[in-house]
Amino acid sequence: MSPRDRFAILPSGEIRINDRSLIDLVREVELPFAQEEYNERITSGEDPSKVDLIAGNYSYLPPKMVMFPSKHLLDEPYRIAEEGFILKPEDSRRGKTTILGCTCGILECWFLLARISLTETTVTWSDFQQFHRDWWTYNLGSFIFARQDYELQLRGTF
C-alpha cells in the first residue's frame, strides 16, 4: 500500500495524524463506550462526583521514549503489555506497541496499543486497542505513513 496519511510529532511528544491530535482522534471513538460505562456506573449508585468520563484520558509518551535514538515507534518497541502483565500466547494484545499512556504518569495504568508494521517505504498503524477495555472497538482504520517522512519526524528533523 502507498502512504496516504501524515504523521507529525512535536518536541513535547504530541502525535498528530493528518493534522489532528492523536488523543482527539481516540477520544472520538472512545466516547460512546466511555459514556455507556459512565451511565452504568451512575445507574448502579456510584457517586457522580467520583466517576470520570474516561474517553481520551491519555497523555503522550515522553519524547525520550519515542524520539530517536529510541526505536519504540519503529521496530524495537517497549512491550509494556507483555512485560508488565501475564498474557496468554494467543492474546490479541501481544505484539502491539504502546502509543499513549496514562495521565497519572504510570504508563501501565491506562494505555492504548496499536500494531505498527514496517516496510521499506511505509509505516502502518492499525488494530488499535485499549489494554484494559478489549471490548471497546476502535474504528480508526489503518494509518499508512511514508517511512522516510515518519523517521524524519522521529529524528526531529522535519
For the regions a protein language model found, what residue spans apply to each?
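Intrinsically disordered, low-complexity acidic regions enriched in Pro/Ser/Thr
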Residues: M1-F158
